[in-house]
Amino acid sequence: MKERLLRRYAGTPTRRYVSAAAGPFPLLSLLLLLPMACFSQRLTPLSNAPDWDQLNRFQETMTREAFVDLLGSVYAPNGAGAQWIKVEATRALIQENASDQFVLQFASSAESSKTVPRYWTAAANLAANNDLPLSGVKIAIDPGHLGGTWAKMEERWFQIGDSIPVTEGDMTLRVAQLLVPRLQSLGAKVTLVRSSPGPVTTVRPDELNTQAEASLRESGIKNILPSYAGPDDPNREDSIPWEAQRLFYRVGEIHTRAQIINEKIKPDLVLCLHFDAEPWGTSTNPVLVSVNHLHLLINGAYSTGELGFDDERFAMLWKLLDQTYPEELACSEYVAQSMARITGLPPYRYSSPNAKSVGWSGYVWARNLLANRLYECPVIFIEAYVMNSQEFFARFQAGEYEGFRNFGGVMRQNIFEEYVQGTVEGIAAYFRATRGKR
């Protein structure tokens, strides 16, 4: 489902200390330093201050031309990063925070570029294998959102009368479960990031009240509410409990999944599974719409406001320098073509400035989401179907039937099998076409 704009707030500033060497007026020195300390770092909710020294691994791994091209065409279009990134002839000067700079040295030529150190392997670096195109490939499957009782908190479910509830987190988990043996049969080593309906983080909303209040204040909410009256309360977004819940499932949960992916699984590819939706009103009296569509997302299209946060700027540079873009785009295009052919869905088109069309099919868009930002490897982020479309609702209610059934004059497989088939065929086709082509 398309992510709402996140509220953000400034993180805890870096502590600075004044020694006796500060002079005869230590208190005055402290007061002079205080403004710099208070505003030296700006972080998104629940984020740690980035360790900029980690970017030293990318010194001289990319030419100036390649850096400028990716920055302007994919990651920070329309000069979004100009305030913090100054490109010179042989280096880029990057603001770490309000007071410190990181210096990135460019490679003098593509031939002299140093090898990019990363935990994932590009498909082109694998030996050709048409029989088992995913042999030696580590794939992490990230079923989007939460299921079970958590779905109501996340507002990712709806029900019409006595029908089967439509719950995105349960549906993505079911698709993931079906994907595992299919990908394994093609040689892949597959790991589920989430294998049950509940969260992978151990933090719960009631532990995030302090951060929630800070987030609301940073967003300019003056009348912060201590509680709200339920999902239909029009003022719920101004309350601490609602904001704490949002930070729990939208931010903390994704940070934990990122730790699992980057520190434990270390895959070559992540599949983020989602079902899209249009506004449906209330969960107990939803509006079904006639539109149904498909699109895929890769990381990019950062705004000036987003790059004003130190951790987002750091993560953007990591993705750019890690050179995930070519892999993400090419693989996403293969999956998009496969899913479009099997589902018959048209491409979704963004009209907002927070997304940029990339590639050639019309199905793939660059967008800055927390998951595709924090996962330090190629991410294929699928938004298939519109959950509250009339067509999808009818097919979902039919369940996991065998074979084909007639829907609106078209013989269709069950919705889960269709999702799985489109994904598997696209990934297999990409690796068959790309392996051994370095």
Feature map (PLM): residue ranges:
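Short polybasic linear motifs
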Residues: 2-8, 12-16
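Catalytic-site microenvironment of enzymes
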Residues: 5, 39-438
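N-terminal signal peptide c-region/cleavage motif recognized by signal peptidases
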Residues: 35-37
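Hydrophobic alpha-helical transmembrane segments of integral membrane proteins
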Residues: 23, 31-32
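A periodicity- and composition-biased signal for non-globular, repetitive helical segments
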Residues: 10-14, 21-22, 263, 280
